[in-house]
Amino acid sequence: RGNLDYVRTLVYWFNWTDRKRKFTIYNDIIERSLLTLKMMSFYNGAVLASLTTSLPEAVGEVRNWDYRFCWLRDASMSIETLFKIGHADAARKFMKFIQSTFVAEHDTYQIMYGIRGERKLTEVILDHLSGYKNSQPVRIGNDAYHQRQNDSFGYLMDLIYQYYRLMPGTLDEIEDMWEMVKSIMTTVMEDWRTPDKGSWEIRGGGQHFVSCKVRGWV
């Protein structure tokens, strides 16, 4: 039984990697990178920013965040890479995931969600854990879900455009997505001049970031 499961696993991953385009140079490196993105994907289409929590940006310092969530920005870039290289199914699942997380009122949109679409991602510090190389605090949850990051929707809208340009759906699918796109556009037009936290997720006051203005233009 164990050997059969092993063979099935091999067949699955060989079939998955065979769907991608072949490259004359760096093919092995590209393949390993795609496998990493795939391993960070959930069956419902969500893509995690990382599989880890509380690994410090610098050992001994306090910027130790929980990245085990689906950021619209990060996930859109990951899915666009998979899509352009031959994995349309990943993009299709992600489109369904984001539609399941969005609601009609545009002011409730978030920059990130839990892997099952959870909206409340309250950050908690685990004082009883010492952290990686004594880098405290150790956190679960991420309060960045409250933040405004004006670049996020630009990445998502670019992915939606790329997807429907190459994969036209049914009329019902397109109409459902169009309702969401219109609502996103309303949010962007209202917020793009407003200071925000940017992709750096600063925890102080909001600022004006050029990257966010550019993504608003997108």
Residue ranges and their predicted role:
Residues 1-218:
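Acidic, mature catalytic/reactive cores of soluble proteins
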